[in-house]
């Protein structure tokens, strides 16, 4: 077993797995270090709702075999309304998806080391040259990539990670069977992915039901402990309590039962990234962070960050001098903002405003969605300041002012 590689990747999630897949396909010597054991992977990191769309499926050639259910629509709910829109998608079996990434990279020659907990970088001359794991084990490479998510042991050691606790979103998800997907008074969620804005269920966040076929669905709650959460939270409630409260009060769960062993927990940070690279090093995926701030979609963004990191590494290692300096790898930062998360500042600002709005305002938002043209909705969702401004009402001025105040003070 060699201890010198072209690239070391810490973490085998969607970002790390895709980076390994692309680099191995290009013929580089790649080593992936993954904390979990091979037999259990990914039992402790199986934390994604795993909803995605055809653009992602096609861009990364994700096979149908890892899809639980193909969906036809997306649904947005408020406390008293719902909005349907035709948007084909797919709900993945996340564990199968992550194992597929491993198989793809290994088939092209990548080496995976499971039971390998990364602890800190190996430094020479002020630059990272390798990784220490499992206490005293060492491995070296020209380029090191941190794809470990919020734990970020390498990025933190290199002072590239400023993940803030107050920007951390936490989520919990169960899988249910026996669901009633279309009771009276509710939209039909058959073959749909639904997000619900309702502070009674998810103060400062959202809840979801993703149909996974038959009478089964993924059901979860996610929120940030933000201004919206502080203003609307129920005293003493944990995130588990909110999910239980929802499932006990919503008729869609009247005859539903949790599927044993199908519980997922996780967290991600909803904030602007800082610098993402330095000499011989890049941080990708939720280490950065990368999840879409508005709707929480992470698979596409993380895989794209892995892909642009792989492209950056390919460029640096193809150079006859193998230039992996900070100035060369800074191309990754540029590609991230151009291709992974364009207009991320606008989407973050819109997200912070959204979660400060009241339940009554959520009902009015859905009224607007029913009457506004698709072109305006697409532009607003894409982060267009003009389209976003045109959706504001007079009552939103106080939310705009408070969000702007906090935005610039932080």
From Swiss-Prot:
Function comment: Is involved in the reduction of 2,3-digeranylgeranylglycerophospholipids (unsaturated archaeols) into 2,3-diphytanylglycerophospholipids (saturated archaeols) in the biosynthesis of archaeal membrane lipids. Can fully reduce the unsaturated isoprenoid side chains of membrane phospholipids and glycolipids. Is also able to reduce the omega-position isoprene of dolichol phosphate.
Name by which UniProt lists this protein: Digeranylgeranylglycerophospholipid reductase
Positions contributing to FAD binding: 15, 34, 118, 286, 298-299
Q: What class of enzyme is it?
A: oxidoreductase
Q: Name one GO molecular function term.
A: oxidoreductase activity
Q: What is the documented disruption phenotype for this protein?
A: Reduced pigmentation of cell colonies and lack of fully reduced isoprene chains of membrane phospholipids and glycolipids.
Give the cofactor note text: Binds 1 FAD per subunit.
Lineage of the organism: Archaea, Methanobacteriati, Methanobacteriota, Stenosarchaea group, Halobacteria
What organism does the UniProt record list as the source? Haloferax volcanii (strain ATCC 29605 / DSM 3757 / JCM 8879 / NBRC 14742 / NCIMB 2012 / VKM B-1768 / DS2)
Q: In which pathway does it act?
A: Membrane lipid metabolism; glycerophospholipid metabolism
Enzyme Commission code(s) on record:
1.3.-.-
A Pfam family per the record: FAD_oxidored
Concerning its family, UniProt says:
Belongs to the geranylgeranyl reductase family. DGGGPL reductase subfamily.
The catalysed reaction is: a 2,3-bis-O-phytanyl-sn-glycerol 1-phospholipid + 8 A = a 2,3-bis-O-(geranylgeranyl)-sn-glycerol 1-phospholipid + 8 AH2; 2,3-bis-O-(phytanyl)-sn-glycerol 1-phosphate + 8 A = 2,3-bis-O-(geranylgeranyl)-sn-glycerol 1-phosphate + 8 AH2; CDP-2,3-bis-O-(geranylgeranyl)-sn-glycerol + 8 AH2 = CDP-2,3-bis-O-(phytanyl)-sn-glycerol + 8 A; archaetidylserine + 8 AH2 = 2,3-bis-O-phytanyl-sn-glycero-3-phospho-L-serine + 8 A
What InterPro entries does this protein's entry cite? Dggglyphlred_Halo (IPR054884), FAD/NAD-bd_sf (IPR036188), Geranylgeranyl_reductase (IPR050407), GGR_cat (IPR054715)
Q: Kindly list the positions annotated as binding a 2,3-bis-O-(geranylgeranyl)-sn-glycerol 1-phospholipid.
A: 343, 379
The answer on whether this UniProt entry bears the keyword Signal reads no
Which keywords does this Swiss-Prot/TrEMBL entry list?
FAD, Flavoprotein, Lipid biosynthesis, Lipid metabolism, Oxidoreductase, Phospholipid biosynthesis, Phospholipid metabolism
Q: Which cofactor does it need?
A: FAD
* Example GO BP: phospholipid biosynthetic process
């Amino acid at each position: 077993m060699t201890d010198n590689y072209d690239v070391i990747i810490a973490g085998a999630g969607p970002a790390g797995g895709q980076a390994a897949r692309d680099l191995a396909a290009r013929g580089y010597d790649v080593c992936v270090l993954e904390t979990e054991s091979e037999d259990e992977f990914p039992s402790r990191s199986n934390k994604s709702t795993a909803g995605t769309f055809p653009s992602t499926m096609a861009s990364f050639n994700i096979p149908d075999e890892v899809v639980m259910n193909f969906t036809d629509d997306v649904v947005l709910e408020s406390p008293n309304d719902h909005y349907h829109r035709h948007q084909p998608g797919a709900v993945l079996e996340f564990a199968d998806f992550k194992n597929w990434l491993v198989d793809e990279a290994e088939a092209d020659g990548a080496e995976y080391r499971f039971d390998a907990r990364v602890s800190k970088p190996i430094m020479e001359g002020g630059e990272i040259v390798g990784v220490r794991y499992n206490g005293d084990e060492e491995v070296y490479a020209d380029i090191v990539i941190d794809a470990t998510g919020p734990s970020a042991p390498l990025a933190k050691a290199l002072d590239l990670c400023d993940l803030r606790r107050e920007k951390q979103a936490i989520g919990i998800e169960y899988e249910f069977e026996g669901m009633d997907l279309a009771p009276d008074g509710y939209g039909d969620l058959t073959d749909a992915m639904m997000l619900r804005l309702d502070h009674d269920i998810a103060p400062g966040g959202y809840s979801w039901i993703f149909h996974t076929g038959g009478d089964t669905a993924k059901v979860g709650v996610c929120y940030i402990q933000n201004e919206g959460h502080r203003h609307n939270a129920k005293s003493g409630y944990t995130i588990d309590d909110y999910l239980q409260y929802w499932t006990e009060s919503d008729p869609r769960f009247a005859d539903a039962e949790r599927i044993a062993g199908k519980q997922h927990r996780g967290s991600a940070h909803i904030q602007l990234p800082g610098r993402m690279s330095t000499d011989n090093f890049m941080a990708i995926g939720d280490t950065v962070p990368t999840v879409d701030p508005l709707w929480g979609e992470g698979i596409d963004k993380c895989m794209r960050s892995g892909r642009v990191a792989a492209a950056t590494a390919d460029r640096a290692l193809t150079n006859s001098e193998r230039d992996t300096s900070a100035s060369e790898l800074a191309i990754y930062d540029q590609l991230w903002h151009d291709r992974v998360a364009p207009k991320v500042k606008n989407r973050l600002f819109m997200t912070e405003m959204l979660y400060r709005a009241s339940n009554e305002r959520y009902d009015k938002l859905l009224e607007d969605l029913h009457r506004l043209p698709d072109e305006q909705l697409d532009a607003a969702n894409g982060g267009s300041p003009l389209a976003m401004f045109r959706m504001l009402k007079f009552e939103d001025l106080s939310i705009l002012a408070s969000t702007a105040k906090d935005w610039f003070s932080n």
